[in-house]
C-alpha cells in the first residue's frame, strides 16, 4: 500500500511504475482473500487501461480478465460472466475466431457458466472449443486432449454420462498412446474414466481401473506419496460401494495408518481417513470398532 501510494504521489497515477504497483497491491489483496479491496483496485486498473491504451488493447483485455476472475473467486458470478462475455466478443472481433486468445476466453466464460450452474451454456461453449482445437491443432494436441476432458467433465456434472464416458474413453486411449502408460496425465485420465463408470453404476469396470491406478502409483511414485494414498482411498470407496467390504476395510486401515505416520493424528486428512474407516466398520456391522474411531462411548 505504501509503495503504491508513494509512486502515485511522486510519479503520477498514470506512470507505468504506479500502474505496476497498483497491480501488485490488487494481487496481494486477492491472494489474501480481501476480494472487495482487490475488486475496487482492479476496476480502477481496467478503467485506466481502457483510457490509456484503448478498449481493444491487450492491456485492457488482460485487466478485464483479471477483474472477471476476481469476481468469480468472490462468488459474484453474474458480474464475472458479463465481463467474460464482453471479453470473448471483443477478442473474437479483433483477433479472429481461430486465435488462441479467443479459445482461452471462451473457456473462461464456459467455466463461469459452469460455476453458476448454467451447464447447458457451458457445454455449448466447451463443445465449440473442442471442435476448434481439433480442427486447428489436431486430435492429439495437448490442448485438444485437455478440451475433451473438460467437456467430458461438464457432461458428467450435468448427469449426461452416456455422452461423458465415450469422451473419457477416447482421452485415455489417446493420452496413453501419445504420452505413455506411466505419464501422470494417463493416470489422471484413467481416474476420470473410472469415476464416470462408478457414477453410472458400472462398478466392476470402475474398480478395475482404480486397481490399475493404485498399482501404478505405488510402482511409479512409491507407497508414501499423497497421490498413492488418494488412489488407495478411492479404490476402497469403490469396493465399499460394490458391497465388497472385506476388500475395502484393509485399504482404509492401511490408509489411516500411513496418514497418521506421515501427517500426524490430528491432520484434517488423517481425520477424514479415520472417518472413512469408521463408516466402513459400521457398514460391516463392526460397531464397537467404529465407535472407537468415532470417539463415542
What name fits each language-model region?
Residues 1-297:
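Intrinsic-disorder-linked linear interaction elements in eukaryotic regulatory proteins
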Amino acid at each position: 500500500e505504501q509503495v503504491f501510494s508513494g509512486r502515485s504521489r511522486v510519479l503520477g497515477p498514470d506512470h507505468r511504475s504506479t500502474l505496476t504497483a497498483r497491480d501488485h497491491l490488487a494481487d496481494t489483496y486477492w491472494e489474501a482473500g480481501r476480494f472487495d479491496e482487490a475488486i475496487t483496485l482492479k476496476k480502477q486498473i481496467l478503467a485506466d487501461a481502457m483510457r490509456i491504451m484503448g478498449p481493444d488493447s491487450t492491456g485492457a483485455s488482460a485487466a478485464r480478465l483479471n477483474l472477471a476472475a476476481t469476481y468469480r473467486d468472490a462468488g459474484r458470478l453474474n458480474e464475472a460472466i458479463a465481463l467474460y462475455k464482453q471479453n470473448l466478443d471483443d477478442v473474437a472481433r479483433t483477433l479472429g475466431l481461430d486465435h488462441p486468445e479467443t479459445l482461452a476466453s471462451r473457456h473462461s466464460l464456459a467455466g463461469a457458466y459452469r460455476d453458476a450452474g448454467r451447464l447447458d451454456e457451458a457445454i455449448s461453449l466447451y463443445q465449440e472449443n473442442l471442435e476448434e482445437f481439433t480442427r486447428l491443432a489436431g486430435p492429439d494436441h495437448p490442448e485438444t486432449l485437455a478440451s475433451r476432458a473438460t467437456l467430458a467433465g461438464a457432461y458428467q456434472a450435468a448427469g449426461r454420462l452416456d455422452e461423458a464416458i465415450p469422451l473419457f474413453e477416447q482421452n485415455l486411449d489417446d493420452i496413453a498412446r501419445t504420452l505413455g502408460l506411466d505419464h501422470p496425465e494417463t493416470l489422471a485420465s484413467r481416474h476420470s474414466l473410472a469415476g464416470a463408470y462408478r457414477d453410472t453404476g458400472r462398478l466392476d469396470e470402475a474398480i478395475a481401473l482404480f486397481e490399475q491406478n493404485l498399482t501404478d502409483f505405488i510402482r511409479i511414485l512409491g507407497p508414501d506419496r499423497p497421490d498413492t494414498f488418494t488412489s488407495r482411498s478411492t479404490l476402497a470407496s469403490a469396493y465399499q460401494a460394490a458391497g465388497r467390504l472385506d476388500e475395502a476395510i484393509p485399504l482404509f486401515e492401511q490408509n489411516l495408518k500411513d496418514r497418521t505416520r506421515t501427517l500426524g493424528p490430528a491432520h484434517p486428512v488423517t481425520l477424514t481417513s479415520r472417518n472413512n474407516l469408521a463408516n466402513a466398520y459400521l457398514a460391516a456391522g463392526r460397531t464397537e470398532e467404529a465407535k472407537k474411531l468415532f470417539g463415542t462411548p
